[in-house]
Design a protein with these regions (language model features):
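Gram-negative and organellar
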Residues: 1-349
Length: 349
């Protein structure tokens, strides 16, 4: 703390995920839920090391306002991935406001850039899972960019606004809204991704021994992707620009929940319950048909839907200040409508 209103922070973190799962060799397997392949296939135990370090500087403008800026660098080393090493630079800015004793508002902006270490880029790592080699001999068939969107070069911008309100002693209200944009520098696979989300949570304590709470939120995503249809003739992949196609992704996620917590026996027995419902919808709108426009308009994939109901109850009893037991029960009901999975039947040779 070099000055009364200025604070400096530094942080560093090391995390290693060591995957000790043995490598397995499958002499035959069912491909695409349709046919039996006798070409050997090996599993690739994925593991990584993540290192990060950064600094943050904060300054109190006035007692009701504080601003801060930060920088974080994150490096990841991976095993069994096309991108064995990548680094990401993350820049952030935050403004905290407290216009009244019952209002807290935070606005933030984050810009990050992830870059691949080109010296440690192996686009054909996937061949390691085929000890005998892949059946298709044309290297262009792999379109490895489709397999690395989560680790390849990416630029991200994110803005977020959160607030915490306590208009009266018995009520707390939290609100947030966020938007981010991802831009991937690849010719195929995921190109761009946009996401807009918001959420509200409310907590109400009508009496000291009872608390009621609820929340609602929604996220809407939109993306662009490029791919290529790659037919196989005589065990050789056919690669042509005329077979490129593009698609637009649309995703919507909704979440609702409510519950309660009650002190049945003050400082001894507590009982709570809650219910949550989640709903999501996914669309893939094709905008270009393989083979060129002469083949006609592209056909979009059917929508995909997911629903999750979750009901829970918790009961805890405290014997002493340091000893307690807790019992929980959860019931979940999951429903999905997925055109790619619904008609699949068990394979028989």
């Amino acid at each position: 703390r070099p000055m009364e209103k200025l604070t400096l922070k530094g942080k560093a973190r090391f995390y290693e995920f060591a995957n000790e799962t043995p490598e397995l060799l499958f002499t035959s397997y069912v491909g695409y839920d349709a046919s039996l392949s006798t070409r050997g296939r090996a599993s690739l135990p994925y593991e990584y090391i993540k290192r990060s370090g950064g600094v943050e500087a904060g300054y109190e403008i006035i007692p009701q306002a504080r601003a801060s800026v930060g920088y974080l660098r994150e490096g990841i080393s991976r095993n069994h991935r096309e991108v064995e090493a990548s680094n990401e630079d993350i820049y952030s800015g935050t403004l905290d406001l407290r216009p009244a004793h019952w209002v807290n508002v935070r606005s933030s902006y984050v810009h990050s850039e992830r870059k691949t270490d080109t010296a440690k880029y192996h686009p054909h790592f996937f061949e390691e899972s085929f000890p005998e080699g892949e059946a298709v001999t044309n290297v262009a068939m792999s379109l490895d960019e489709l397999r690395r969107f989560d680790v390849y070069n990416r630029r991200r911008d994110k803005v977020e606004l959160t607030s915490q309100l306590s208009p009266i002693d018995k009520v707390d209200v939290g609100m947030n809204v966020s938007f981010y944009e991802d831009d991937y520098s690849a010719d195929y696979g995921l190109q761009k991704l946009w996401n807009l989300g918001w959420g509200i949570d409310v907590m109400y304590t009508p009496i000291p021994r009872l608390t009621l709470f609820g929340d609602v939120g929604q996220e809407n995503g939109r993306g662009e992707m490029e791919s290529r249809y790659r037919p196989v003739y005589s065990n050789v992949g056919y690669d042509s620009l005329n077979n490129d196609w593009s698609g637009a992704l649309r995703e919507k996620f909704e979440n609702y929940g409510f519950g309660f917590s009650a002190d049945v026996w003050p400082q001894k027995l507590t009982w709570g319950g809650n219910y949550g419902f989640s709903y999501s919808q996914g669309e893939l709108l094709s905008t270009f048909a393989p083979g060129g426009n002469s083949n006609g308009d592209a056909a979009s994939f059917p929508n995909v839907y997911y629903k999750l109901h979750r009901v829970g109850s918790q009961l805890s009893y405290r014997f002493t200040g340091q000893t307690a037991v807790k019992f929980e029960y959860w019931y979940e009901k999951y429903i999905q409508t997925d055109w790619a999975i619904d008609p699949v039947q068990p394979f028989t040779n």
